[in-house]
Amino acid sequence: MENFPIINLEKLNGSERDATMEMIKDACENWGFFELVNHGIPHEVMDTVEKLTKGHYKKCMEQRFKELVASKGLEAVQAEVTDLDWESTFFLRHLPVSNISEVPDLDDEYREVMRDFAKRLEKLAEELLDLLCENLGLEKGYLKKAFYGSKGPNFGTKVSNYPPCPKPDLIKGLRAHTDAGGIILLFQDDKVSGLQLLKDGQWIDVPPMRHSIVVNLGDQLEVITNGKYKSVLHRVIAQTDGTRMSLASFYNPGSDAVIYPAPTLVEKEADQECKQVYPKFVFDDYMKLYAGLKFQAKEPRFEAMKAREADVKSDPIATA
């Protein structure tokens, strides 16, 4: 079996740059996922985020989750549960306006650490988007501009904990789905596994690795690249032992950003018989549709957007 792609970003600064860019290209085209090491976020920052996230779960969320499980009788289920996930979560919004001050139960140190971590992740996400531009033959900044809308991108972090589950064969930690947005940066537990992606009909484990950042591509990048890069189904398998920590940070288009295939990429494929044309739509409209269809196939979402394409009035962005 092929090895899960692990990319050392430091190698972009030396003689191995071309080979590293090729690895990123291959990961985007054939996996939709890759794992970054030497990504520039200090290990001590990540260690502090992990310590505070796990402490916050123990102090503020663990008991709440146990009460939820008891109230729904989940420990005694006999058949597969298809309408909920075995996870305890909260969401931090960073852009365009942060909600970190308003989220209840966070202590001041945790708020400050997460603000700093978010800034570092935002910078890394934008660096990655430019690397994708380079590999795609798009001008530098194209993807950031495509995501911008009138108020800049949406950026936020879903903080999740996946506690031990008595019936992991019947309840998923998180059901299979593709991500709706742009580019996703995941800081995951390095001891408790569970994340899997679907490749060539097989579920493949995403290996836990200390101080790494897992990257995956969302539906919007599939549209903008005209299918050259694809979002990939992934899920979290609940475990009988250990609580898995996951901080998934979503760098998404602004709500009013108009998303459509980059013209230069459509032109490059004009000679191909199987040219697939993706729709043009406002990102917020896609998200409203996704909210009810997250755990279903993405293709009907694209078709639904295509049916409403005539309503999209906004002009294309001025690059390409």
Curated annotation (Swiss-Prot):
Enzyme Commission number, as recorded: 1.14.17.4
Binding site for Fe cation: H177, D179, H234
Pathway in which this enzyme or protein is active: Alkene biosynthesis; ethylene biosynthesis via S-adenosyl-L-methionine; ethylene from S-adenosyl-L-methionine: step 2/2
Name of the protein in question: 1-aminocyclopropane-1-carboxylate oxidase 3
Family matches, as InterPro entries: DIOX_N, IPNS-like_FE2OG_OXY, IPNS-like_sf, Oxoglu/Fe-dep_dioxygenase_dom, Plant_2OG-oxidoreductases
Cited Gene3D superfamilies: B-lactam Antibiotic, Isopenicillin N Synthase, Chain
Residue intervals of the Fe2OG dioxygenase domain: 153-253
Stored Pfam families: 2OG-FeII_Oxy, DIOX_N
Catalytic activity: 1-aminocyclopropane-1-carboxylate + L-ascorbate + O2 = ethene + L-dehydroascorbate + hydrogen cyanide + CO2 + 2 H2O
Coiled coil: none
Gene Ontology BP annotations: coumarin biosynthetic process; ethylene biosynthetic process; response to molecule of fungal origin
Enzyme class: oxidoreductase
One GO molecular-function entry: 1-aminocyclopropane-1-carboxylate oxidase activity
Alphabetic keyword roster: Ethylene biosynthesis, Iron, Metal-binding, Oxidoreductase, Vitamin C
Family: Belongs to the iron/ascorbate-dependent oxidoreductase family.
SUPFAM superfamilies: Clavaminate synthase-like
Needed cofactors: Fe cation
Organism of provenance: Petunia hybrida
